[in-house]
């Protein structure tokens, strides 16, 4: 049931304005997902010290290519590998037919913060693309989202979503699953932390990851495996490049 609002004008001056179509659609989708999906969030920190060193070393190559290498392509590749290794995350539930729809493709949505609200363009076949191709495509789609130039087909077909607040701040959050997907990865701001290496504490750049998932489709042990795979991949840049 909806929540009946009081007359706020009795408390002070107010102004009413119509919701944009995007805001109304997003609100409906969020409410539908939250009401229908039993959410659980698994948290993990990934050591991205070496990854960041490698990424920053690509600055000159990026200038030649006209592409900026951000952390997002690494996250995309890591998620694509994890989805391939743990295919129970690459499904949708058809509750009416009592069936699990298993997808043989890996398309990943990237949440983009725009002046007009949140938009989620989709990168197709992430598992078949290299880091530079993913960097170029994600930048192009994000710009199209900000310019309100995305086509409907460019926002459809995702198996999984990545939403990042790392450029703003925060240490963890619970992203809402974008149903009919069954999982979404939230990325917070990386920070230097002391990490014990067996002999002494070392300063390491740690990236907080928050994996929300549909507990009907995914159990807790598999969620822990998924974030562990992500942490291992992001912590060893060689594994992502193979």
Residue map of PLM features:
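C-terminal catalytic/motor cores of large multi-domain enzyme assemblies
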Residues: 1-242
